[in-house]
């Protein structure tokens, strides 16, 4: 409520009916966002394997001898021959070998990094009541 006041143009009194309005604002929070991400990774692995192989060798030898006794010769895989009783001998040998075979298995581990993007949407609203109404009574104008 207002009280009386004086002015250069006259005396006036403000009436007692003063209505103030109230203003309310409401705001709704934004809704949650969705995000997608992609990542790439590299990994290293180690493996162990075992293999087996077999080989065989054969040898032949020939010998000749001179003297009172005949010569003998033996052959080994490396192909050597000896002679006895004044005899000399030579020998030749051959080796055959099959290649070994093996198998192995390994395991690997990797790490990756990714990026994620997020978007968020929201809405806001506000409302208010009608403005102030003022009733005045002017006297002695």
From Swiss-Prot:
Biased composition (Polar residues): 11-23, 130-141
Transmembrane stretches, start-end: none
Annotated spans, Disordered: 1-141
Comp. bias (Low complexity): 69-85, 114-129
Entry PTM: Phosphorylated with a circadian rhythmicity, probably by the double-time protein (dbt). Phosphorylation could be implicated in the stability of per monomer and in the formation of heterodimer per-tim.
Alphabetically ordered keywords of this record: Biological rhythms, Cytoplasm, Nucleus, Phosphoprotein, Repeat
Region 32 X 2 AA approximate tandem repeats of G-T, annotated ranges: 30-94
Start-end of each Sequence repeat: 30-31, 33-34, 35-36, 37-38, 39-40, 41-42, 43-44, 45-46, 47-48, 49-50, 51-52, 53-54, 55-56, 57-58, 59-60, 61-62, 63-64, 65-66, 67-68, 69-70, 71-72, 73-74, 75-76, 77-78, 79-80, 81-82, 83-84, 85-86, 87-88, 89-90, 91-92, 93-94
GO biological process: rhythmic process
Main location: nucleus
Gly residues bias: start-end ranges: 29-68, 101-113
Cellular component GO terms held in the UniProt record: nucleus; perinuclear region of cytoplasm
Compartments reported by the entry: Nucleus; Cytoplasm, Perinuclear region
Entry domain remark: The run of Gly-Thr is implicated in the maintenance of circadian period at different temperatures. Deletion of the repeat leads to a shortening of the courtship song cycle period, and thus could be important for determining features of species-specific mating behavior.
Subunit and interaction comment: Forms a heterodimer with timeless (TIM); the complex then translocates into the nucleus.
Role: Essential for biological clock functions. Determines the period length of circadian and ultradian rhythms; an increase in PER dosage leads to shortened circadian rhythms and a decrease leads to lengthened circadian rhythms. Essential for the circadian rhythmicity of locomotor activity, eclosion behavior, and for the rhythmic component of the male courtship song that originates in the thoracic nervous system. The biological cycle depends on the rhythmic formation and nuclear localization of the TIM-PER complex. Light induces the degradation of TIM, which promotes elimination of PER.
Protein name: Period circadian protein
Gene source species: Drosophila serrata
